[in-house]
């Protein structure tokens, strides 16, 4: 899909579906956590900027070398991070800042209808979300919604799934 007109169409539909999900969870105008997509991930390059318009503050992840995510506010000067992902500069927060969010929007490689999310296998998001009572929506393309994904006891289920076709709660 990379670089194609079809990907642009799907990614624009993901923005629309994500904003609808934000509204459904009552998170518009509250703090939201999201991500800057890699070219292989769902969402356009300006995904964070588009979501920031709906948030009081948009927090973006920063990958630390020890497999932990830190968070910084969108709008701080961006720089290439450790994993090649564009990350904001500025004050860093622990994942406890997610407690202030009305919604966490997370990328995934796949998600099943029970809400189990398949990430890239490093467990960054599972560690960040462990023990937090915050709604999480996984963003995938429609064909990445599957019957079942492999998961372990530490894997965190999501509360909603966002695709170009819309979103659904688990």
Q: What positions do the PLM features span?
A:
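N-terminal active-site beta-alpha-beta segment that forms phosphate/nucleotide-binding
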Residues: 1-95, 99
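Conserved phosphate- and dinucleotide-binding cores of soluble alpha/beta proteins
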Residues: 67-170
């Amino acid at each position: 899909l990379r670089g194609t007109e079809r990907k642009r169409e799907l990614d624009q539909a993901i923005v629309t579906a994500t904003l609808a999900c934000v509204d459904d969870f009552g998170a518009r105008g509250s703090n939201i956590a999201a991500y800057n997509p890699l070219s292989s991930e769902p969402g356009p390059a300006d995904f964070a900027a588009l979501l920031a318009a709906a948030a009081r503050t948009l927090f973006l992840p920063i990958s630390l070398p020890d497999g932990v995510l830190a968070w910084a506010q969108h709008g701080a000067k961006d720089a290439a991070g450790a994993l090649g992902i564009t990350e904001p500069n500025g004050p860093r927060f622990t994942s406890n800042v997610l407690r202030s969010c009305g919604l966490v929007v997370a990328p995934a490689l796949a998600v099943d209808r029970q809400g189990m999310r398949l990430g890239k296998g490093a467990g960054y998001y599972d560690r960040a979300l462990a023990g937090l009572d915050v709604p999480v929506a996984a963003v995938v393309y429609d064909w990445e919604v599957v019957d079942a994904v492999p998961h372990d006891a530490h894997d965190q289920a999501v509360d909603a799934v966002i695709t170009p076709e819309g979103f659904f709660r688990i």
